[in-house]
Amino acid sequence: MELQVVGANALTVSETTFGREFNEALIHQVVVAYAAGARQGSRAQKTRAEVSGSGKKPWRQKGTGRARSGDIKSPIWRSGGVTFAAKPQDHSQKVNKKMYRGAIKSILSELVRQDRLIVVEKFEVEAPKTKVLVQKLKELALEDVLIITASLDENLFLAARNLYKVDVRDVQGIDPVSLIAFDKVVVTVDAVKQIEEMLA
């Protein structure tokens, strides 16, 4: 199959990478796993066994008129332990390489079908200036956009850093979540070739 390149000849690409069927279930599973892996999972509370303090009975069982009490670390006391204390947890989910690559291929194929994948010969800015990039994006009628280059261009990265809904990644930095988060995806010809090699 062929992808149209802005201002140049069409680029022949692999059908298996850019012409796959849309697999919503696979994409959902991979995106959920990706988001789960980003969770910190470090919350921690203390049970009554872990709270610092004496284990001595505060006052005798009977005769004081007060409610009976056996431990100042009781969960019903102020500063006591937590009944079902939260503990650090690993939320990560296992995703096979084949599934992960399949999800990215499926997303790229859907972007092509929806005309949301724009292939350009190259995408550069002369200086790390936001206004230079804004002008370039205006010329291409782009606002909400992910720009993927073969290698990370520092000028382009710095120019895009302060722009809302504009992100710059190299091929190694793409993931399913970023691919579906933007309205349009701009990819350079060299990046397309690298993506094909990476997902082969």
Curated annotation (Swiss-Prot):
Renumbered residue ranges of the record's region Disordered: 43-71
Keywords for the protein's UniProt record, in alphabetical order: Ribonucleoprotein, Ribosomal protein, RNA-binding, rRNA-binding
InterPro entries: Ribosomal_uL4, Ribosomal_uL4-like, Ribosomal_uL4_dom_sf
Entry superkingdom: Bacteria
HAMAP family in the cross-refs: Ribosomal_uL4_B
UniProt record similarity statement: Belongs to the universal ribosomal protein uL4 family.
This protein's name: Large ribosomal subunit protein uL4
Gene from which this protein is expressed: rplD
